[in-house]
Amino acid sequence: MTKLKIKSGDTVRVIAGDHKGQEGKVQKVLIEKNKAIVEGVNMISKHEKPSASNPQGGIKEKEAPIHISNLSLIDKNGDTTRVGYKEEDGKKVRFSKKSNEVI
């Protein structure tokens, strides 16, 4: 299993696939599938049956998972960057390899 360098709450840009160039915030990371759900990216239509809580039913838009190899982290400067790890004050922290700033 590979090390996931993207976490929930990170801002990412899609670098490959149909949604290339779109940006969004990571809502959830699916570790076992190496995928992430990104806000506003890879939208799908979900057909819902009428139920007691939703008597109308209908078609809902929702985000589908996207593979993490198609995502790149955006640092504070707005550039895509790779992620590195270093120790600071005895704690392991992530840092941007482009700007060398702690994420």
Swiss-Prot record:
Pfam hit, one: ribosomal_L24
One GO BP annotation of this record: translation
UniProt key word rRNA-binding: yes
Signal peptide: none
Keywords: Ribonucleoprotein, Ribosomal protein, RNA-binding, rRNA-binding
Domain of life: Bacteria
Gene Ontology CC annotations of this record: ribonucleoprotein complex; ribosome
InterPro entries linked: KOW, Rib_uL2_dom2, Ribosomal_uL24, Ribosomal_uL24_CS, Ribosomal_uL24_KOW, Translation_prot_SH3-like_sf
GO molecular function: rRNA binding; structural constituent of ribosome
Subunit structure: Part of the 50S ribosomal subunit.
Similarity section: Belongs to the universal ribosomal protein uL24 family.
Function: One of two assembly initiator proteins, it binds directly to the 5'-end of the 23S rRNA, where it nucleates assembly of the 50S subunit. One of the proteins that surrounds the polypeptide exit tunnel on the outside of the subunit.
Protein name: Large ribosomal subunit protein uL24
Gene from which this protein is expressed: rplX
